[in-house]
UniProtKB/Swiss-Prot annotation:
Biological process annotations from GO: ATP synthesis coupled electron transport; electron transport coupled proton transport
GO MF term list: NADH dehydrogenase (ubiquinone) activity; ubiquinone binding
Compartments where located: Plastid, Chloroplast thylakoid membrane
EC code(s) of this entry: 7.1.1.-
Keyword entries, A-Z: Chloroplast, Membrane, NAD, NADP, Plastid, Plastoquinone, Quinone, Thylakoid, Translocase, Transmembrane, Transmembrane helix
Membrane topology qualifier: Multi-pass membrane protein
Main location: plastid
Keyword Thylakoid: yes
Keyword NAD: yes
InterPro entries in alphabetical order: NADH_Q_OxRdtase_chain4 (IPR022997), NADH_Q_OxRdtase_chainM/4 (IPR010227), NADH_UbQ_OxRdtase (IPR003918), ND/Mrp_TM (IPR001750)
Gene of this entry: ndhD
One annotated Gene Ontology cellular component of this protein: chloroplast thylakoid membrane
Species this protein is from: Angiopteris evecta (Mule's foot fern)
Protein name: NAD(P)H-quinone oxidoreductase chain 4, chloroplastic
Amino acid sequence: MSSLPWLTIIVLLPICAGLLIPLFPNEGNKIIRWYTLGICIIEFLLITYIFCCHFRINDQSLQLEEDYNWIDLINFHWRLGIDGLSMGLILLTGFVTTLATLAAWPVTRNTRLFHFLMLAMYSGQIGLFASQDILLFFFMWELELIPIYLLLSIWGGKRRLYSATKFILYTAGGSIFLLIGALTIGLYGNNGPLFDIQSLATRSYPIALEIIIYSGFLIAYAVKLPIFPFHTWLPDTHGEAHYSTCMLLAGILLKMGGYGLIRINMELLPHAHAIFAPWMVMFGAVQIVYASLISLNQRNLKRRIAYSSVSHMGFVMIGIGSLTNIGLNGAILQMISHGLTGAALFFLAGTSYDRTRTLFLDQLGGIAISMPKLFTMFSIFSLASLALPGMSGFVAELMVFLGIVISQNYSLTFKIVITIIEAIGIILTPIYLLSMLRQMFYGYKIPNTLALSLIDSGPREIFISLCLLLPIIGIGLYPNLVLSLWNSEVEYILSQY
Protein backbone atom coordinates (compact mmCIF):
# COMPACT_ATOMS: atom_id res chain seq x y z
CA MET A 1 0.00 0.00 0.00
CA SER A 2 1.41 3.37 -1.06
CA SER A 3 1.43 6.21 1.45
CA LEU A 4 1.22 8.90 -1.23
CA PRO A 5 -2.06 9.83 -2.99
CA TRP A 6 -0.66 9.00 -6.40
CA LEU A 7 -3.93 9.26 -8.30
CA THR A 8 -4.75 12.69 -6.88
CA ILE A 9 -1.24 13.82 -7.80
CA ILE A 10 -1.53 12.77 -11.45
CA VAL A 11 -5.05 14.21 -11.75
CA LEU A 12 -4.20 17.62 -10.29
CA LEU A 13 -0.61 18.09 -11.49
CA PRO A 14 -1.37 19.21 -15.08
CA ILE A 15 -4.06 21.76 -14.28
CA CYS A 16 -2.20 23.12 -11.24
CA ALA A 17 0.95 23.48 -13.33
CA GLY A 18 -1.15 25.15 -16.02
CA LEU A 19 -2.27 27.81 -13.54
CA LEU A 20 1.35 28.99 -13.40
CA ILE A 21 1.50 29.65 -17.16
CA PRO A 22 0.07 33.22 -16.88
CA LEU A 23 3.19 34.11 -14.87
CA PHE A 24 5.32 33.61 -17.99
CA PRO A 25 5.82 36.54 -20.38
CA ASN A 26 3.43 36.46 -23.32
CA GLU A 27 6.32 36.85 -25.76
CA GLY A 28 8.16 33.83 -24.38
CA ASN A 29 6.59 31.24 -26.67
CA LYS A 30 9.58 28.93 -26.49
CA ILE A 31 9.62 29.00 -22.67
CA ILE A 32 5.90 28.22 -22.46
CA ARG A 33 6.21 25.37 -24.96
CA TRP A 34 9.13 23.78 -23.12
CA TYR A 35 7.41 24.24 -19.76
CA THR A 36 4.19 22.57 -20.96
CA LEU A 37 6.07 19.74 -22.64
CA GLY A 38 8.12 19.24 -19.46
CA ILE A 39 4.95 18.99 -17.34
CA CYS A 40 3.46 16.46 -19.78
CA ILE A 41 6.63 14.35 -19.71
CA ILE A 42 6.77 14.44 -15.89
CA GLU A 43 3.10 13.45 -15.75
CA PHE A 44 3.64 10.56 -18.15
CA LEU A 45 6.69 9.39 -16.20
CA LEU A 46 4.61 9.45 -12.99
CA ILE A 47 1.89 7.40 -14.69
CA THR A 48 4.52 4.93 -15.89
CA TYR A 49 6.02 4.74 -12.39
CA ILE A 50 2.59 4.03 -10.87
CA PHE A 51 2.00 1.31 -13.45
CA CYS A 52 5.38 -0.33 -12.93
CA CYS A 53 5.71 -0.04 -9.14
CA HIS A 54 2.22 0.19 -7.64
CA PHE A 55 -0.15 -1.54 -10.07
CA ARG A 56 -0.79 -5.29 -9.90
CA ILE A 57 -1.68 -6.89 -13.23
CA ASN A 58 -4.34 -9.65 -13.18
CA ASP A 59 -5.86 -8.21 -10.02
CA GLN A 60 -9.51 -7.39 -10.74
CA SER A 61 -9.96 -5.49 -7.47
CA LEU A 62 -9.76 -1.70 -7.32
CA GLN A 63 -6.22 -0.47 -6.66
CA LEU A 64 -4.68 2.73 -5.23
CA GLU A 65 -8.05 3.74 -3.79
CA GLU A 66 -8.44 7.27 -2.44
CA ASP A 67 -11.55 8.65 -0.77
CA TYR A 68 -11.87 12.23 0.48
CA ASN A 69 -15.13 13.79 1.59
CA TRP A 70 -15.90 16.78 -0.63
CA ILE A 71 -19.53 17.98 -0.24
CA ASP A 72 -21.26 16.48 2.81
CA LEU A 73 -24.75 17.66 1.88
CA ILE A 74 -24.99 15.37 -1.15
CA ASN A 75 -22.40 12.78 -0.07
CA PHE A 76 -20.08 13.86 -2.90
CA HIS A 77 -16.61 12.35 -2.51
CA TRP A 78 -13.28 12.80 -4.28
CA ARG A 79 -13.07 9.05 -4.82
CA LEU A 80 -10.40 7.64 -7.12
CA GLY A 81 -9.22 4.15 -7.97
CA ILE A 82 -7.91 2.19 -10.94
CA ASP A 83 -8.11 -1.27 -12.41
CA GLY A 84 -6.76 -2.76 -15.63
CA LEU A 85 -9.39 -1.10 -17.82
CA SER A 86 -8.75 2.40 -16.52
CA MET A 87 -4.96 1.89 -16.31
CA GLY A 88 -4.71 1.10 -20.02
CA LEU A 89 -6.61 4.24 -20.98
CA ILE A 90 -4.64 6.39 -18.51
CA LEU A 91 -1.40 5.19 -20.13
CA LEU A 92 -2.86 5.99 -23.56
CA THR A 93 -3.87 9.46 -22.33
CA GLY A 94 -0.42 10.27 -21.00
CA PHE A 95 1.29 9.01 -24.14
CA VAL A 96 -0.93 10.75 -26.71
CA THR A 97 -1.20 14.03 -24.79
CA THR A 98 2.58 14.31 -24.48
CA LEU A 99 2.97 13.77 -28.23
CA ALA A 100 0.10 16.18 -28.99
CA THR A 101 1.87 18.85 -26.95
CA LEU A 102 5.00 18.30 -29.01
CA ALA A 103 2.88 18.39 -32.17
CA ALA A 104 1.55 21.82 -31.13
CA TRP A 105 5.06 23.31 -31.35
CA PRO A 106 4.21 25.54 -34.38
CA VAL A 107 1.37 27.28 -32.46
CA THR A 108 2.54 30.84 -31.76
CA ARG A 109 -0.74 32.74 -31.19
CA ASN A 110 -2.02 33.07 -27.61
CA THR A 111 0.37 30.35 -26.50
CA ARG A 112 -0.31 30.84 -22.78
CA LEU A 113 -4.02 30.13 -23.14
CA PHE A 114 -3.45 27.33 -25.66
CA HIS A 115 -1.08 25.37 -23.44
CA PHE A 116 -3.15 25.97 -20.31
CA LEU A 117 -6.16 24.45 -22.10
CA MET A 118 -4.06 21.46 -23.15
CA LEU A 119 -3.05 20.85 -19.53
CA ALA A 120 -6.62 21.34 -18.28
CA MET A 121 -7.79 18.68 -20.74
CA TYR A 122 -5.02 16.39 -19.52
CA SER A 123 -6.31 16.59 -15.94
CA GLY A 124 -9.90 16.03 -16.99
CA GLN A 125 -9.07 12.94 -19.02
CA ILE A 126 -6.96 11.32 -16.30
CA GLY A 127 -9.59 12.23 -13.71
CA LEU A 128 -12.40 10.65 -15.69
CA PHE A 129 -10.62 7.32 -16.12
CA ALA A 130 -9.68 7.25 -12.41
CA SER A 131 -13.08 8.37 -11.03
CA GLN A 132 -14.91 5.98 -8.71
CA ASP A 133 -17.71 8.42 -7.84
CA ILE A 134 -20.38 8.86 -10.49
CA LEU A 135 -20.75 12.59 -9.78
CA LEU A 136 -16.98 13.02 -10.00
CA PHE A 137 -17.16 11.08 -13.28
CA PHE A 138 -19.69 13.64 -14.55
CA PHE A 139 -17.54 16.53 -13.28
CA MET A 140 -14.50 15.26 -15.19
CA TRP A 141 -16.68 14.57 -18.24
CA GLU A 142 -17.75 18.23 -18.25
CA LEU A 143 -14.22 19.51 -17.61
CA GLU A 144 -13.37 18.57 -21.20
CA LEU A 145 -16.02 20.69 -22.89
CA ILE A 146 -14.79 24.26 -22.36
CA PRO A 147 -11.10 23.60 -23.25
CA ILE A 148 -12.08 21.87 -26.50
CA TYR A 149 -14.60 24.59 -27.34
CA LEU A 150 -11.95 27.29 -26.87
CA LEU A 151 -9.23 25.34 -28.69
CA LEU A 152 -11.60 24.92 -31.62
CA SER A 153 -13.10 28.42 -31.69
CA ILE A 154 -9.77 30.28 -31.33
CA TRP A 155 -7.26 28.10 -33.21
CA GLY A 156 -9.61 26.42 -35.69
CA GLY A 157 -10.17 26.95 -39.40
CA LYS A 158 -12.49 29.28 -41.29
CA ARG A 159 -15.69 27.62 -40.03
CA ARG A 160 -14.38 27.24 -36.49
CA LEU A 161 -17.22 29.10 -34.75
CA TYR A 162 -19.87 26.98 -36.44
CA SER A 163 -18.00 23.77 -35.59
CA ALA A 164 -17.34 24.87 -32.00
CA THR A 165 -20.99 25.77 -31.47
CA LYS A 166 -22.12 22.46 -32.93
CA PHE A 167 -19.68 20.60 -30.70
CA ILE A 168 -20.81 22.33 -27.52
CA LEU A 169 -24.51 21.88 -28.34
CA TYR A 170 -24.13 18.16 -29.01
CA THR A 171 -21.88 17.36 -26.07
CA ALA A 172 -23.63 19.62 -23.55
CA GLY A 173 -26.97 18.18 -24.65
CA GLY A 174 -25.67 14.66 -24.09
CA SER A 175 -24.22 15.67 -20.73
CA ILE A 176 -27.69 16.63 -19.47
CA PHE A 177 -28.75 13.00 -19.86
CA LEU A 178 -25.58 11.86 -18.11
CA LEU A 179 -26.32 14.13 -15.14
CA ILE A 180 -29.95 13.02 -14.93
CA GLY A 181 -28.88 9.38 -15.04
CA ALA A 182 -26.19 9.91 -12.39
CA LEU A 183 -28.61 11.66 -10.03
CA THR A 184 -31.33 9.06 -10.59
CA ILE A 185 -29.06 6.11 -9.90
CA GLY A 186 -27.45 7.87 -6.92
CA LEU A 187 -30.65 9.03 -5.24
CA TYR A 188 -32.61 5.80 -5.75
CA GLY A 189 -33.47 4.06 -2.49
CA ASN A 190 -34.20 5.17 1.05
CA ASN A 191 -30.68 5.32 2.47
CA GLY A 192 -29.70 8.76 1.20
CA PRO A 193 -27.47 9.77 -1.72
CA LEU A 194 -24.96 7.15 -2.86
CA PHE A 195 -22.63 7.89 -5.76
CA ASP A 196 -19.83 5.36 -5.11
CA ILE A 197 -19.54 3.30 -8.31
CA GLN A 198 -18.37 0.18 -6.44
CA SER A 199 -21.36 0.34 -4.08
CA LEU A 200 -23.79 1.11 -6.90
CA ALA A 201 -22.62 -2.06 -8.67
CA THR A 202 -24.15 -4.13 -5.85
CA ARG A 203 -27.58 -2.49 -6.14
CA SER A 204 -30.51 -3.84 -8.12
CA TYR A 205 -33.19 -1.75 -9.80
CA PRO A 206 -36.65 -2.36 -11.29
CA ILE A 207 -36.10 -3.32 -14.92
CA ALA A 208 -38.16 -0.37 -16.22
CA LEU A 209 -36.08 2.11 -14.20
CA GLU A 210 -32.87 0.40 -15.25
CA ILE A 211 -33.83 0.76 -18.92
CA ILE A 212 -34.62 4.46 -18.45
CA ILE A 213 -31.32 5.14 -16.67
CA TYR A 214 -29.42 3.10 -19.25
CA SER A 215 -31.03 5.08 -22.08
CA GLY A 216 -29.94 8.39 -20.55
CA PHE A 217 -26.36 7.24 -20.15
CA LEU A 218 -26.38 5.75 -23.65
CA ILE A 219 -27.35 9.06 -25.25
CA ALA A 220 -24.43 10.82 -23.53
CA TYR A 221 -21.97 8.13 -24.61
CA ALA A 222 -23.46 7.96 -28.11
CA VAL A 223 -22.50 11.60 -28.63
CA LYS A 224 -18.93 11.10 -27.39
CA LEU A 225 -18.14 7.73 -28.99
CA PRO A 226 -19.86 8.68 -31.42
CA ILE A 227 -22.78 6.46 -32.44
CA PHE A 228 -24.98 7.10 -35.48
CA PRO A 229 -26.98 9.40 -35.70
CA PHE A 230 -25.21 11.47 -32.98
CA HIS A 231 -21.95 11.60 -34.93
CA THR A 232 -22.35 14.65 -37.16
CA TRP A 233 -20.41 16.99 -34.84
CA LEU A 234 -17.25 14.91 -35.25
CA PRO A 235 -16.36 15.54 -38.94
CA ASP A 236 -17.03 19.28 -38.54
CA THR A 237 -14.91 19.45 -35.39
CA HIS A 238 -12.02 17.48 -36.86
CA GLY A 239 -12.24 19.40 -40.11
CA GLU A 240 -11.68 22.76 -38.39
CA ALA A 241 -9.57 21.96 -35.29
CA HIS A 242 -5.79 22.32 -35.12
CA TYR A 243 -4.21 18.93 -35.64
CA SER A 244 -2.85 18.75 -32.08
CA THR A 245 -6.44 19.14 -30.86
CA CYS A 246 -7.52 16.47 -33.35
CA MET A 247 -4.95 14.12 -31.83
CA LEU A 248 -6.59 14.54 -28.42
CA LEU A 249 -10.09 14.19 -29.85
CA ALA A 250 -9.37 11.01 -31.82
CA GLY A 251 -6.83 9.59 -29.40
CA ILE A 252 -8.64 10.10 -26.10
CA LEU A 253 -11.97 11.94 -26.19
CA LEU A 254 -13.83 9.30 -28.22
CA LYS A 255 -12.59 6.62 -25.82
CA MET A 256 -14.40 8.34 -22.95
CA GLY A 257 -17.70 7.23 -24.50
CA GLY A 258 -16.59 3.62 -24.85
CA TYR A 259 -15.17 3.63 -21.33
CA GLY A 260 -18.47 4.96 -19.95
CA LEU A 261 -20.43 2.24 -21.72
CA ILE A 262 -18.27 -0.45 -20.12
CA ARG A 263 -17.68 1.09 -16.69
CA ILE A 264 -21.17 2.47 -16.03
CA ASN A 265 -23.68 0.76 -18.32
CA MET A 266 -22.26 -2.76 -18.43
CA GLU A 267 -21.10 -2.87 -14.82
CA LEU A 268 -23.97 -1.09 -13.06
CA LEU A 269 -26.92 -1.91 -15.35
CA PRO A 270 -26.39 -5.46 -16.64
CA HIS A 271 -30.06 -6.34 -17.21
CA ALA A 272 -30.68 -3.28 -19.35
CA HIS A 273 -27.42 -3.84 -21.22
CA ALA A 274 -28.48 -7.38 -22.10
CA ILE A 275 -31.64 -5.89 -23.65
CA PHE A 276 -29.79 -3.15 -25.54
CA ALA A 277 -26.85 -5.35 -26.64
CA PRO A 278 -28.45 -6.68 -29.88
CA TRP A 279 -29.33 -3.14 -30.93
CA MET A 280 -25.77 -2.01 -30.25
CA VAL A 281 -24.44 -4.83 -32.42
CA MET A 282 -26.82 -3.92 -35.26
CA PHE A 283 -26.09 -0.20 -35.06
CA GLY A 284 -22.36 -0.92 -34.86
CA ALA A 285 -22.41 -3.08 -37.98
CA VAL A 286 -24.45 -0.54 -39.94
CA GLN A 287 -22.20 2.27 -38.70
CA ILE A 288 -19.10 0.54 -40.06
CA VAL A 289 -20.55 0.39 -43.57
CA TYR A 290 -22.35 3.75 -43.46
CA ALA A 291 -19.31 5.71 -42.25
CA SER A 292 -17.05 3.93 -44.76
CA LEU A 293 -19.32 4.92 -47.66
CA ILE A 294 -19.57 8.52 -46.43
CA SER A 295 -15.79 8.67 -45.94
CA LEU A 296 -15.24 7.58 -49.53
CA ASN A 297 -17.18 10.64 -50.74
CA GLN A 298 -15.30 13.21 -48.64
CA ARG A 299 -13.10 15.72 -50.48
CA ASN A 300 -11.58 17.07 -47.27
CA LEU A 301 -8.69 14.97 -45.95
CA LYS A 302 -9.44 15.46 -42.24
CA ARG A 303 -13.16 14.82 -42.73
CA ARG A 304 -12.32 11.55 -44.49
CA ILE A 305 -10.17 10.48 -41.54
CA ALA A 306 -12.93 11.62 -39.15
CA TYR A 307 -15.50 9.38 -40.82
CA SER A 308 -13.00 6.53 -40.68
CA SER A 309 -12.97 7.09 -36.89
CA VAL A 310 -16.76 6.77 -36.84
CA SER A 311 -16.44 3.52 -38.78
CA HIS A 312 -13.81 2.12 -36.41
CA MET A 313 -15.97 2.92 -33.39
CA GLY A 314 -18.57 0.58 -34.88
CA PHE A 315 -16.27 -2.32 -33.98
CA VAL A 316 -16.19 -1.07 -30.39
CA MET A 317 -19.99 -1.17 -30.28
CA ILE A 318 -20.11 -4.69 -31.69
CA GLY A 319 -17.52 -5.91 -29.19
CA ILE A 320 -19.39 -4.36 -26.26
CA GLY A 321 -22.66 -5.81 -27.49
CA SER A 322 -21.28 -9.29 -28.15
CA LEU A 323 -21.26 -10.13 -24.41
CA THR A 324 -18.26 -12.41 -24.92
CA ASN A 325 -14.80 -12.30 -23.37
CA ILE A 326 -12.99 -12.16 -26.69
CA GLY A 327 -15.40 -9.58 -28.12
CA LEU A 328 -15.18 -7.18 -25.17
CA ASN A 329 -11.40 -7.55 -25.03
CA GLY A 330 -11.34 -6.75 -28.74
CA ALA A 331 -13.49 -3.65 -28.22
CA ILE A 332 -11.12 -2.28 -25.58
CA LEU A 333 -8.12 -3.12 -27.74
CA GLN A 334 -9.80 -1.34 -30.66
CA MET A 335 -10.11 1.79 -28.51
CA ILE A 336 -6.39 1.66 -27.70
CA SER A 337 -5.44 0.88 -31.31
CA HIS A 338 -7.57 3.64 -32.79
CA GLY A 339 -6.26 6.06 -30.18
CA LEU A 340 -2.81 5.56 -31.69
CA THR A 341 -3.63 5.29 -35.40
CA GLY A 342 -6.24 8.06 -35.33
CA ALA A 343 -3.88 10.45 -33.57
CA ALA A 344 -1.14 9.62 -36.07
CA LEU A 345 -3.31 10.15 -39.16
CA PHE A 346 -4.60 13.51 -37.95
CA PHE A 347 -1.07 14.59 -37.07
CA LEU A 348 0.20 13.70 -40.53
CA ALA A 349 -2.81 15.37 -42.17
CA GLY A 350 -1.96 18.53 -40.25
CA THR A 351 1.71 18.46 -41.23
CA SER A 352 0.63 17.95 -44.84
CA TYR A 353 -1.59 21.03 -44.59
CA ASP A 354 1.27 23.07 -43.11
CA ARG A 355 3.18 22.46 -46.34
CA THR A 356 0.54 22.43 -49.08
CA ARG A 357 -1.96 24.83 -47.42
CA THR A 358 -4.88 22.70 -48.57
CA LEU A 359 -6.87 19.77 -47.20
CA PHE A 360 -8.88 19.09 -50.36
CA LEU A 361 -7.86 15.82 -51.94
CA ASP A 362 -8.74 16.99 -55.46
CA GLN A 363 -6.18 19.80 -55.05
CA LEU A 364 -3.43 17.45 -53.93
CA GLY A 365 -1.43 14.86 -55.82
CA GLY A 366 2.13 14.20 -56.86
CA ILE A 367 3.78 15.09 -53.55
CA ALA A 368 5.30 11.66 -52.86
CA ILE A 369 8.49 12.50 -54.76
CA SER A 370 9.13 15.77 -52.93
CA MET A 371 8.03 14.44 -49.50
CA PRO A 372 8.99 10.74 -49.37
CA LYS A 373 9.18 10.62 -45.56
CA LEU A 374 5.65 11.99 -45.16
CA PHE A 375 4.45 9.61 -47.88
CA THR A 376 6.06 6.62 -46.14
CA MET A 377 4.60 7.46 -42.73
CA PHE A 378 1.15 8.23 -44.13
CA SER A 379 1.17 4.92 -45.99
CA ILE A 380 2.20 2.93 -42.91
CA PHE A 381 -0.46 4.47 -40.67
CA SER A 382 -3.12 4.08 -43.35
CA LEU A 383 -2.26 0.39 -43.52
CA ALA A 384 -2.44 0.24 -39.73
CA SER A 385 -5.88 1.87 -39.86
CA LEU A 386 -7.17 -0.68 -42.35
CA ALA A 387 -6.04 -3.44 -39.95
CA LEU A 388 -3.01 -4.84 -41.74
CA PRO A 389 -1.83 -8.11 -40.11
CA GLY A 390 1.02 -7.46 -37.72
CA MET A 391 -0.52 -4.23 -36.47
CA SER A 392 -2.81 -3.58 -33.51
CA GLY A 393 -5.95 -2.90 -35.54
CA PHE A 394 -5.86 -6.37 -37.09
CA VAL A 395 -5.87 -8.11 -33.71
CA ALA A 396 -8.64 -5.86 -32.38
CA GLU A 397 -10.96 -6.29 -35.37
CA LEU A 398 -10.29 -10.03 -35.52
CA MET A 399 -11.21 -10.41 -31.85
CA VAL A 400 -14.43 -8.43 -32.31
CA PHE A 401 -15.22 -10.50 -35.41
CA LEU A 402 -14.69 -13.76 -33.52
CA GLY A 403 -16.52 -12.42 -30.48
CA ILE A 404 -19.80 -12.05 -32.34
CA VAL A 405 -19.32 -15.35 -34.20
CA ILE A 406 -18.88 -17.44 -31.04
CA SER A 407 -21.47 -15.55 -28.99
CA GLN A 408 -24.15 -17.80 -27.47
CA ASN A 409 -26.51 -14.86 -26.99
CA TYR A 410 -27.64 -14.55 -30.61
CA SER A 411 -29.22 -16.77 -33.22
CA LEU A 412 -27.23 -18.18 -36.12
CA THR A 413 -29.15 -16.03 -38.62
CA PHE A 414 -28.40 -12.86 -36.66
CA LYS A 415 -24.69 -13.70 -36.45
CA ILE A 416 -24.49 -14.46 -40.18
CA VAL A 417 -26.12 -11.14 -41.10
CA ILE A 418 -23.87 -9.15 -38.76
CA THR A 419 -20.78 -10.98 -39.98
CA ILE A 420 -21.62 -10.23 -43.63
CA ILE A 421 -22.16 -6.53 -42.86
CA GLU A 422 -18.86 -6.45 -40.94
CA ALA A 423 -17.10 -8.09 -43.87
CA ILE A 424 -18.48 -5.45 -46.25
CA GLY A 425 -17.13 -2.74 -43.94
CA ILE A 426 -13.74 -4.43 -43.79
CA ILE A 427 -13.66 -4.44 -47.62
CA LEU A 428 -14.67 -0.77 -47.85
CA THR A 429 -11.99 0.39 -45.40
CA PRO A 430 -8.98 -0.14 -47.72
CA ILE A 431 -10.96 1.39 -50.58
CA TYR A 432 -11.34 4.80 -48.93
CA LEU A 433 -7.92 4.75 -47.26
CA LEU A 434 -5.93 3.66 -50.32
CA SER A 435 -7.83 6.06 -52.57
CA MET A 436 -6.89 8.80 -50.10
CA LEU A 437 -3.22 7.88 -50.51
CA ARG A 438 -3.57 7.80 -54.30
CA GLN A 439 -5.19 11.24 -54.43
CA MET A 440 -2.63 12.78 -52.08
CA PHE A 441 0.66 11.37 -53.23
CA TYR A 442 0.32 10.12 -56.81
CA GLY A 443 -0.39 11.99 -60.05
CA TYR A 444 0.63 15.50 -61.07
CA LYS A 445 -2.06 17.82 -59.73
CA ILE A 446 0.27 20.03 -57.70
CA PRO A 447 2.38 22.22 -60.04
CA ASN A 448 5.94 21.02 -60.34
CA THR A 449 7.30 24.35 -59.05
CA LEU A 450 5.30 23.97 -55.82
CA ALA A 451 6.13 20.28 -55.50
CA LEU A 452 9.84 21.03 -55.70
CA SER A 453 9.56 23.67 -52.96
CA LEU A 454 7.77 21.42 -50.46
CA ILE A 455 9.83 20.54 -47.39
CA ASP A 456 9.71 16.96 -46.17
CA SER A 457 9.00 15.91 -42.57
CA GLY A 458 11.57 17.08 -40.04
CA PRO A 459 13.06 15.34 -36.99
CA ARG A 460 10.22 16.42 -34.65
CA GLU A 461 7.55 15.01 -36.95
CA ILE A 462 9.44 11.79 -37.58
CA PHE A 463 9.97 11.34 -33.84
CA ILE A 464 6.24 11.75 -33.10
CA SER A 465 5.34 9.33 -35.89
CA LEU A 466 7.81 6.69 -34.72
CA CYS A 467 6.59 7.00 -31.12
CA LEU A 468 3.04 6.26 -32.31
CA LEU A 469 4.13 3.50 -34.67
CA LEU A 470 6.15 1.42 -32.20
CA PRO A 471 3.24 0.51 -29.87
CA ILE A 472 1.02 -0.19 -32.90
CA ILE A 473 3.50 -2.79 -34.15
CA GLY A 474 4.31 -4.03 -30.64
CA ILE A 475 0.65 -4.68 -29.82
CA GLY A 476 0.07 -6.18 -33.26
CA LEU A 477 2.87 -8.69 -32.81
CA TYR A 478 2.27 -9.42 -29.12
CA PRO A 479 -1.27 -8.36 -28.08
CA ASN A 480 -0.94 -9.97 -24.63
CA LEU A 481 1.28 -7.00 -23.87
CA VAL A 482 -1.91 -5.04 -23.17
CA LEU A 483 -4.70 -7.64 -23.09
CA SER A 484 -3.39 -8.97 -19.78
CA LEU A 485 -4.01 -5.52 -18.28
CA TRP A 486 -7.80 -5.63 -18.40
CA ASN A 487 -8.69 -9.30 -19.00
CA SER A 488 -9.52 -9.96 -15.34
CA GLU A 489 -11.80 -6.90 -15.26
CA VAL A 490 -13.53 -8.11 -18.43
CA GLU A 491 -14.13 -11.52 -16.85
CA TYR A 492 -15.59 -9.86 -13.76
CA ILE A 493 -17.99 -7.68 -15.78
CA LEU A 494 -19.15 -10.57 -17.96
CA SER A 495 -19.74 -12.79 -14.91
CA GLN A 496 -22.96 -10.80 -14.40
CA TYR A 497 -24.38 -11.98 -17.73
